[in-house]
Amino acid sequence: MRRLILPALPLALAACAATGTAFPTQSAATAQTAPLEIDRAAYARRMEGFWLGQSIANWTGLVTEMDKIGGEGPRGEFYTREDWGQPDQPSIFDPGQPSTISPAIDFVLRTPGESWGADDDTDIEYIYQDALLKHRTSILTPEQIRQAWIDHIYDETKPTPYGTDETGYQNYLWVSNQRAHELMLAGTLPPETSDPALNEHWEMIDAQLSTEIFGLFAPGRPDVALRMADLPIRTAARGEAADIARFHVALHALSAKVDPQRPLGPQLRAIAEEAAELLPEGEYPRAMYRFVLAQYESGATWEEARDAVYQRYQVDMQDGYDISSRGLYCNGCFAGGINFAAGLVSYFYGEGDLRDTIRIGTLAGWDSDNPTATWGGLIGSIMGRAAIEEAFGTPLSGSFHIHRTRKGFPNDGYDDFAAMGERSLAIIDRAVAGEAGGSIDRARNIWIIPRP
């Protein structure tokens, strides 16, 4: 049975999505021209849900990160739904050792009294939020980005609290972000830090996983979000990898249109169609989007869709995606492209169900924590913390430890998702009034955001 793609929701309905109130009875024409009104207090709870949902998905996905990347032997025997709850299998990083996070492929949860540790899916976004607040700006300069990275990220050529890895001292940066940081330490400013002549990893996934939050800083206004995210994206990516990051930023901005009281699947497909308009025709991200969507609409299982992605892009190198021809480590398993396609599998087939989306993303393969964390944050922001806890049937920790991977923050790096959400309101206030041409009604505690 074919699944239908519904048209995009009128943007004016996002006020109700943010507040949980009933939808207004207004004409379609009025809905298309009326400014967006969003309750600030309710949106702070959405931001709290973003951090919590992202952390659950990140840590669950880390259990299977790089277990299955294609090729010969066990690493090419992809997981299926039957593997959920079963013992984790070794990754390419340590072929003789399963995950130290969890012995089984299952949800990783932190309950009150515990803390969520930072990872590269959350820590760069935390740094950017802090920098925007520190400088009281909506658009970070090259110098501000460089200084924030240097202030809060360890230099892997010097001792760190985390020991060593195969490239030096552990600093929890990889591929393009690591090279960008090295260039910053040498005095280079973004966007030259992603120049292919200086950074050979510019096609990797780094920019996507470190910039999605900018979409949430500009609710309902992807145009504003993309201006805010432009330089952070180009800090680590160029070309198609940057386009993929822009898609995710726009998707997060458009999520303000989603009504959590209605089925999420059709609404998520609708906003994805809008965000996909940013993907240039004739390039592989647009082709990947259409291919995965066609697999979903055909009635294929998610495993069949994932296997088709592997065959089409990693084996056959269709639609201009030729990473496999370059002899890269792990066949480009960190690349923005293959992980974009794999992530779309969990996005469409998860149909807006947080648990199902995390399950599929965790089992889909490749850099499985990154796309999964993206969707956990997106869906978590729509749900809010209370609904996330209801979905998992248990109270969950709101404590966050940024110093698991980074440095230089107050309180030895311990923070709280609710406080992080509250702090983000100042960023959004500035973006609404300064970048979007909107206003803040303090009496009603709402943003009034005009349409672009």
Regions found by a protein language model. Name each.
Residues M1-L4:
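Positively charged n-region of N-terminal signal peptides that target proteins for export
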Residues A31-A34, I38-G61:
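Mature N-terminal segment immediately following signal peptide/propeptide cleavage
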Residues P35-I38, Y172, S176-M204, T211-P222, ...:
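Accessory "access/gating" subregions that flank catalytic or transport cores
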Residues L52, E114-D120, I124, Q129-A245:
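Active-site cavity-forming subdomains of large catalytic enzyme subunits
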Residues I56, T60, D67-Q89, A237-E240, ...:
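Catalytic phosphate/nucleotide-handling subdomain of diverse soluble enzymes
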Residues L62-L109, T122-I124, E143-G163:
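Active-site-surrounding "flap" and adjacent substrate/cofactor-binding loops of secreted or lumenal enzymes
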Residues G282, R286, R290-S324, Y329, ...:
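Acidic, carboxylate-rich catalytic segments that either coordinate divalent cations
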